[in-house]
From Swiss-Prot:
This is Holliday junction resolvase RecU. It comes from the Bacteria. Binds 1 Mg(2+) ion per subunit. Its EC number is 3.1.21.10.
Length: 196
């Protein structure tokens, strides 16, 4: 096409192909979404009863136009006091935290709060099954790390040690959880290997 000043529009057909080196498993889903879908499958197939604990909310302001139509106009999330998930599996109490990291070389212990560590220790003291699911999004891998191992890394950090768990250590001391269509994060298979 010729424009009034006599110049032609130059078109360039640059097609940028984004190389997608992710495995089929992630497909944009978060770890929490994957765990929730897996827990729903476990519940429907009578394998386990495990639920996500709701995040506590502090309600600040409520508008009451009439008694039956109260509307919360201001609220804030409180910091959760324990771990993300709990329930029962094969007659045993199960309790775990789930975290994702974009870090390729380590899992930062700053992602865990001291109150969560204290809660995990109490679960262990009562002979419950306790662990952390860690997803390395850069590797598209999810691992189950036993809480006792996590507590060891945490205590080393408290004594001036490393502030993160190296990826290679997690690979060596954890169970890799494969992706399945219905059981996206089939962590009970890893629980069976570690605890039963």
């Amino acid at each position: 096409m010729n424009y009034p000043n006599g110049q032609q529009k130059v078109t360039t057909n640059h097609v940028v192909q984004k190389q997608d080196n992710r495995m089929f498993s992630n497909r944009g889903m978060s770890l929490e979404d994957d765990i929730n879908a897996t827990n729903e499958f476990y519940l429907e197939t009578n394998q386990a009863v495990i639920h996500k604990k709701p995040t506590p909310v502090q309600i600040v302001n409520v508008h009451y136009p009439k008694r039956s139509a109260a509307v919360i106009t201001e609220a804030y999330f409180k910091q959760a006091s324990t771990t993300d998930y709990n329930g029962i599996y094969k007659g045993k109490y199960i309790d775990f935290e789930a975290k994702e990291t974009k870090n390729k070389t380590s899992f930062p212990l700053a992602n865990i709060h001291e109150h969560q560590i204290n809660h995990m220790q109490k679960v262990i003291d009562q002979q419950g099954i306790c662990f952390m699911l860690i997803r390395f999004t850069a590797h598209d891998e999810t691992y189950l790390l036993d809480a006792k191992a996590l507590l060891t890394f945490w205590n080393l950090k408290q004594d001036g040690g490393k502030k993160s768990i190296p990826y290679d250590m997690i690979r060596n001391q954890s169970q890799l959880i494969p992706f399945h269509y219905q059981k996206r994060v089939d962590y009970l298979a890893a629980v069976d290997k570690l605890y039963f």
